[in-house]
Amino acid sequence: MPSGGIPTEQSVRFRVGDMPPLAEGFSDRPDTARGILDALIPGSTIALVPGSEFAEGKQNWLGASGKTQIAVMLAETLWRSGAVDMVVWISATSRSAVLSGYAEAWVAATGIEPTGTAESVAAQFVSWLAETSQPWLVVLDDLPSVDELDGLWPHGPSGRLLITSTQSTVAASRRRTRVFPVGFFSVREALSCLTERLSVDPAQRQGAIDLIEALGREPLALAQAAAVIANSALACRDYRDYFARRRQQIGVAAGEVPSAASVTWTLSLGQAEQLLPGQSVRLILVLIALLDGHGIPGTIFNTQSVSIYLGGTAVGFGTPVDLQPAWDALLIIERAGLISINRAEGSPTILMSPVVQAAIRVAAPAQVRDRAARTAANALLEAWPIDEPHPWTAAVLRANAASLQSVATDILWADGCDPLLLRAGRSLDIARLAGPAVEYWRELAVSCDNKLPSGHPDALVVAAQLAGAYLAAGYGAEAVAWYQRVLAERSLDLAPGHPAIIAARVSLADALIVAGKAADAVTALRRAVAESEQFRGPGHPDTLAVRDELARALEAAADVPAAIRLLTQTLAERERLQGAHDVHTMTTRGQLAAALLADGKIKQAISSYKRVLADREAVLGRDHPDTIATKASLAGAYYTSGKMPSAVQLSEQTCADSERVLGADHVDTLARRAALANLYYAAGRLGDAGTVLRDTVARCERVLPSGDPLTQTVHQSLASIAGDG
């Protein structure tokens, strides 16, 4: 799909998300699913929830009714029939997972790279869904609560929303949501499940009806039984006998009759261990049981951590890890019906029912669980890409880290705050998930206070991250409070002039500016500059960077002349030490040009902007975003000086460059088009101004969140032109 384009009826069809495969021998469940497909029409919302059978008794197996498999069937049916052109599948176990899924879908649908926070991108996507004529289906699988969808409910006349949840109250808070309970198999559905799976040898079907009744028609239990029978010489009646004996053994030990699914998984484990003797099957199962059963990246099992866990030896960096033991175990476990492996994507994904995961965790000895948890944490860190080039992969890794944290908290805090917890939080920051990031770091800070001694280094790291998250979310006052705490702690533990203390002062100043306390920011940065000059030297690159920050604070405090003096000094130092064509030198020169313009020194500002533009074109290239931004700034300076023809001509060039490089719907392109329209208006070209503004308004409303300041500004400009016309 072309960059910046909005999909049309002729757009390329696409699917987003890691949709699970249909299970082998899947039954389309004609009795349970009757009417769901007919109800899933454009504009509809359907919720699949557990049937009443799953609320009965002491044991509650809400995750074992087959809701996800029915959702997969419905999605595949709509896709293959051509009823929808877009399928978005999201494992909606948290708000951050939904936000990440929407962001990926937004890029796939529009070709526009996200530029704002994840919340703003999600709002854009929801707005786009409401307006597009392209038929779509969004599946939110395993939604724990409607609170996760506050402001994120997808809707639109061309779309369908399908939700699966263990909470039957999910639909109650949303009008016009049709609820379909998914309970045990009917006899017909159960028989279909068995006979489809046992199609190779009809003799294995002997005793099928008796087995179905023995298993109580529980979907998960039947699927596991069918897998074991299909991979053995057993018939249904043989499995029924094994099942009855094992159920009695477990019931005597537990003091109550266990559910069918709590028995069948142990028989599946027995078969897997017969097929692959040794400890690897159990070790891998416990490892999987601690992670996110909705999707565990196969790359985790390619790590040295897992290799050592299974008995391998450590290898040097760059030396291939022996993958055979882990994948031998995974394939055997899959044959036994305890997991499924989704091979549809580039990298395999391992899936396991939450019911089976819970049973394995209960059965595993504490020492084995703890070792598996330590391995899982290390393997996740090993598999986590440093630069996170693929947002969906990062979202899946965060989900697995969250699952591990929920079941192995003590292990992750045994020696301070585990690096995995910090990595997961930084991943939220990278993904610009501002709201979830604040919540995550805030909870981690509370855990630090409860679990770590006062002054622990990890607590200070978390405090700094929480402050940064508050700042990114626009909560200046909260960011100031936490940065002050960080600075106080740093000052107690470190010597004066330590780089960490200086960095803390700079961060505090950033927060003070956002909080509207520019004068306090100037005070903090003057001290930071003095310390940096004393302990690093006046010409150190970091000292020069802090001086640039001080100049920015001086401008914010309305002391532009002081900012100009400082920037002039810093620029001279940069030219002497780093060279005139260093990127940092160009940045300082551009900052000086802006200050000169703000101070009314227009000719000097234009001269500086011209120099920056020439340098950036020579060093970075004409199409670099910084070069285009400089050209836009120079056009603004021309306008301020009254050189209207030059301003218009350069602004037109800037818009053309921005559309070509960034895309027509990029927020910077939209802002530059609005600026061009204002120049047209100032030049008396009302018709041209109106044409550009109307197009820009339409684009802003389509791709920016509701109430975005740029959209409001463009509307006001258009209204002014209409009034003058």
Question: Which functions belong to the PLM regions below?
Answer:
Residues 1-446, 463-465, 470-488, 512-517, ...:
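Aliphatic-rich helical/repeat scaffold segments used for oligomerization and domain docking
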